[in-house]
């Protein structure tokens, strides 16, 4: 599927640019497309090189975690669950603890920690993959959970809203939590049905119900806190947990009497190799995305939706937030820029700005995640991964729009 989509992204961009030229007399569109090719190819390399430092740091920390026995303890504790959802992964596999650490980092909104840990998890899952150029069921499930990962602390979005002058920047916290939970549940359940995972299993049901209960209690608890304290609490929790994790790893290394520094260096060396590996995959995808954006195709889609909504007498207030939704699967920075632009255009306390913020927090850069995660282990055949990841993204977008109408207040 990804091969066909990649080809069509270029063909659609060319067709769209011709329409812009013929009907809008846009003579600049062709130079914009060519400029996007060169710019995004350079950006892809810059992103990869920029990952080297953070990849090296977290892979070094992971090496210490593996050698101190922390990973084994986590794996042993969660093996009963993973035996159900990832049948090909052996009991007590180190991949289990790495997956848990990755999901925890995503959960706390710690993107810089989540990516390197996620890449390590994909490498570990690759050791159990019998078809090395094709994604396994376990890798697809992990990728979907990453692409739809629940965001418990959307600290960057709250900070942007505060900087743009929103009266109550944390108003989007609960809507984001609900929308991103819907995205995660839809992503997991759809893949579980595809992979014929037994959803009636008591252990799995307990985890799903526990997840729903946790989200519910968190929402209630957060609503009970004053507006002024919410942003501060969100920031403290995320950063404190990260610092405590590093502290626990170092203290355990002292207790176990392992050579932590040497282990860190060994693990950190892998960061450079992984960053270089993903360059061609990133170039291919980011150039295609850049060409599509420069062609004006996204504007055509937005205007068509607005026209259809008005024709059917539907409230189309959400349409002004759709640029964020359309761009987010392709580019995190692009979607963030769209969110900020929406705040500037309509006001930080407007409905489009509110909805745009919720969409930004409840969806993921699906194409980036898929490209980087599978590219790091040289997998070109992603099977049904993209289709199901986009499906969970779509569920997150619909949920974000729905809860925005529910929670928005002037």
Regions found by a protein language model. Name each.
Residues 1, 90, 97-99, 134-139, ...:
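Generic hydrophobic alpha-helical membrane-segment signal
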Residues 100, 104, 139, 230-233, ...:
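Generic signal for short, ordered secondary-structure residues
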Residues 35-38, 45, 94-96, 131-134, ...:
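Hydrophobic alpha-helical segments, principally membrane-spanning helices and signal/leader peptides
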């Amino acid at each position: 599927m990804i091969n066909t989509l990649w080809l069509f992204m270029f063909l659609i961009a060319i067709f769209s640019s011709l329409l812009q030229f013929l009907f809008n007399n846009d003579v600049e569109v062709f130079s914009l497309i060519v400029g996007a090719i060169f710019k995004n190819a350079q950006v892809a390399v810059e992103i990869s090189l920029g990952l080297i430092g953070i990849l090296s740091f977290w892979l070094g920390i992971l090496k210490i975690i593996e050698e101190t026995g922390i990973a084994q303890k986590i794996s042993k504790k969660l093996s009963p669950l993973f035996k159900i959802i990832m049948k090909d992964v052996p009991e007590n596999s180190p991949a289990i603890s790495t997956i848990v650490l990755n999901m925890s980092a995503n959960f706390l909104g710690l993107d810089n920690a989540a990516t390197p840990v996620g890449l390590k998890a994909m490498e570990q899952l690759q050791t159990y993959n019998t078809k090395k150029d094709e994604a396994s069921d376990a890798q697809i499930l992990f990728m979907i959970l990453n692409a739809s990962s629940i965001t418990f602390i959307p600290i960057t979005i709250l900070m942007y809203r505060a900087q743009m002058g929103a009266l109550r920047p944390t108003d989007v916290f609960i809507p984001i939590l609900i929308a991103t939970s819907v995205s995660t549940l839809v992503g997991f359940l759809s893949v579980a049905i595809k992979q014929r995972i037994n959803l009636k299993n008591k252990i799995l049901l307990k985890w799903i119900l526990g997840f729903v209960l946790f989200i519910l209690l968190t929402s209630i608890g957060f609503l009970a806190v004053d507006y002024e304290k919410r942003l501060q609490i969100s920031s403290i929790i995320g950063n404190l947990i990260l610092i405590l994790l590093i502290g626990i790893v170092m203290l355990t290394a002292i207790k176990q009497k392992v050579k932590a520094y040497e282990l860190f260096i060994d693990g950190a060396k892998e960061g450079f190799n992984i960053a270089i590996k993903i360059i061609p995959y990133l170039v291919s995808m980011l150039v295609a995305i850049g060409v599509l954006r420069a062609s004006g195709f996204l504007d055509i889609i937005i205007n068509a939706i607005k026209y259809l909504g008005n024709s059917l007498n539907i409230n189309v207030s959400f349409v002004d937030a759709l640029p964020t939704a359309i761009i987010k699967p392709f580019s995190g920075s692009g979607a963030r820029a769209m969110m900020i632009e929406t705040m500037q255009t309509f006001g930080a306390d407007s409905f489009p700005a509110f909805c745009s913020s919720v969409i930004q927090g409840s969806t993921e850069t699906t194409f980036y995640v898929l490209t980087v995660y599978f590219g790091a282990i040289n997998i070109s055949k992603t099977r049904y991964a993209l289709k199901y990841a986009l499906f969970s993204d779509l569920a997150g977008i619909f949920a974000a729009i729905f809860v925005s109408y529910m929670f928005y207040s002037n």
